Regions:
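Nucleotidyltransferase catalytic core that binds NTPs
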Residues: 1-194, 282
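Short amphipathic alpha-helical face segments that pack within enzyme cores
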Residues: 16, 20-21, 213-216, 276
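Charged phosphate-binding loop/patch that engages nucleotide di/tri-phosphates or the phosphate backbone
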Residues: 172-196, 353-384
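A short, charge-rich alpha-helical start-of-domain segment used by transcription regulators
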Residues: 205-209
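Internal alpha/beta core interface subdomains
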Residues: 345, 352-353
Length: 384
């Protein structure tokens, strides 16, 4: 007889705690397949993300034995749970079905009689949760008609609320969230402030489109090279927050706030918008993280000892898909998939060649970044 598990929850977002419960249940109770059923909004809880977006995140975790069950039945009453269980029963005929839930979910079910009337339901697999007395909740459930409860305990399982709190602090928490899920979160800016709406009044439409494209490209690079994805996402979204200001307005802020006395920077909008942008990111958008602020400051010309976040944003700014084609662009894109430093060096050198070819003056700050990258790459090659 086929053995099927069904885990219901809001999955806002799905995390490794959910998957640990699924894998434990699969192993201990020999489940062939486990369905994950994301609940729609209800009077009980209004999820941060829409049902559609949460389903997409769950889709990053599906496999041959872990599947997404899609429906819009809210878990409002026990009848709703019976209806959801019936969906599984219809799909799998005479299979044995095991609802999987946390102690918190078990405590909220007030009548179990109808659940056990379903011939497919064999037992409840219930996982202990911090803040809930397993003994008391199980006794309460038994008083409401529950029986055949398989009680399991895993090491500390985070809540989705704890995961969202870490995301708000720009922490990828790889010990809590699968990297492919965090990649999707960072790429779309889920659970982060709505920077797109904040930037809309201060950026042109084309600049905003470029910014969103830079975020996607930068986060893709961070994911590929195991760099901090959330920090990269935020830095990419804010990297051009001062770009549409007039040169004189940027100069005034730089002087009034003592951001720089460097004549080269003050005279160049291309250099100045990064410096002023970092100030605005801090003063207007509440950014305090040094990696993010540095990535905004130096995204145009770089600097010695760039972090991976800085490299991802600098590169994404020059290779994102909306960028007009220029000599060497495709080669830099290919390099970026393999090595951030090599790609950044190629990008800065390409810019230098172009500026010199039209008789322009090349920034010594960019040259410092080139020299530093060349030195580091030479050392790496010598060690190899």
């Amino acid at each position: 007889m086929e053995r099927i598990g069904l885990m219901l929850g809001y999955f806002d977002p799905i995390h490794l705690g959910h998957l640990a419960m699924v894998r434990d249940a699969q192993k201990v109770y020999r489940l062939d397949t486990v369905y994950l059923y994301p609940l729609p909004e209800s009077s009980e809880y209004t999820p941060v993300l829409s049902l559609k977006k949460r389903r997409k995140l769950i889709g990053k975790c599906v496999s041959d034995s872990i599947k997404l069950l899609s429906s819009t039945i809210p878990l409002v009453t026990e009848d709703s749970l019976i209806e959801i269980l019936s969906l599984v029963q219809e799909r799998h005929g005479d299979a044995a079905v095991f609802p999987i839930m946390g102690m918190d979910r078990l405590s909220r079910i007030t009548n179990f009689a109808g659940i056990y009337l379903l011939p497919a339901v064999k037992a409840l697999i219930v996982y202990s949760r911090v803040g809930y007395s397993s003994e008391k909740v199980v006794q309460l459930a038994q008083g409401r008609g529950a029986h055949s409860i398989f009680l399991r305990k895993l090491s500390t399982i985070p809540s989705s609320e704890q995961v969202r709190e870490q995301i708000s602090l720009f922490n990828d928490v790889p010990e809590w969230v699968p990297s492919r899920v965090m990649h999707a979160i960072a790429r779309k800016g889920y659970y982060l402030p709505n920077y797109k709406a904040m930037l809309k009044p201060v950026l042109s439409q084309s600049r905003l489109k470029h910014t969103i494209s830079v975020r996607k490209t930068a986060v893709d690079l961070a994911y590929r090279h195991d760099a901090p994805m959330l920090k990269t996402s935020v830095a990419a979204m804010l990297h051009d927050c001062a770009k549409c200001m007039t040169h004189s307005a940027m100069q005034k802020i730089a002087r009034d706030k003592f951001l720089t006395e460097d004549g080269e920077v003050l005279s160049s909008p291309a250099l100045l918008h990064g410096v002023v942008g970092a100030y605005i990111a801090k003063s207007s958008y509440g950014i305090r993280d040094k990696d993010i602020l540095n990535a905004i400051t130096y995204h145009t010309v770089g600097r010695p000892n760039m972090t991976d976040v800085e490299l991802c944003v600098l590169l994404a700014d020059s290779i994102e898909p909306l960028r007009p084609k220029y000599p060497g662009l495709e080669e830099i894109r290919i390099l970026a998939k393999c090595d951030l430093k090599s790609a950044a060096l190629a990008s800065l050198r390409t810019t230098k060649s172009y500026i010199l070819s039209i008789g322009g003056k090349y920034s010594m700050k960019a040259q410092d970044a080139i020299d530093d990258l060349l030195k580091k790459l030479t050392r790496i090659h010598q060690e190899v």
